[in-house]
């Protein structure tokens, strides 16, 4: 269903689907992803446990949890783990689109900031080297 919605809204994501939490963790151990969209209730490993392992591997990973659990303790645990969004089912398609657009914007901002920091560091390094060589 989520793949369908991502495709419907023409979001610029390459989607990899996992059949359960362990499968998803296997994918995460093999390659880097920018966003993890997961359900809480899954076989073998729930979404909170998956989020914990995923964020240990990639602290910058954006995790969006979708849950049918209205018990606030699940949301509290997700917040403690560093999950960026926690959505309750049933999900409205536009709500998912808005959240994913927001997450995508924050990823773009982070990438831009990293490039800017790198350019600033290179400029300072070159400037200092030039200054040192001119004496």
Where are these regions (language model features)?
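Two-component/phosphorelay signaling modules centered on CheY-like receiver
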Residues: 1-16, 30
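Helix N-cap/capping motif at the beta->alpha junctions
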Residues: 17-26, 47
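As written
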Residues: 33, 47, 79-84
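Two-component signal transduction core modules
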Residues: 36, 63, 78, 86-87
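Active-site residues of response regulator receiver
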Residues: 39
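Receiver (REC) domain active-site loop signature in two-component systems and cognate sites
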Residues: 42
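Interdomain helical linkers/hinges and coiled-coil/dimerization scaffolds
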Residues: 79, 85-135
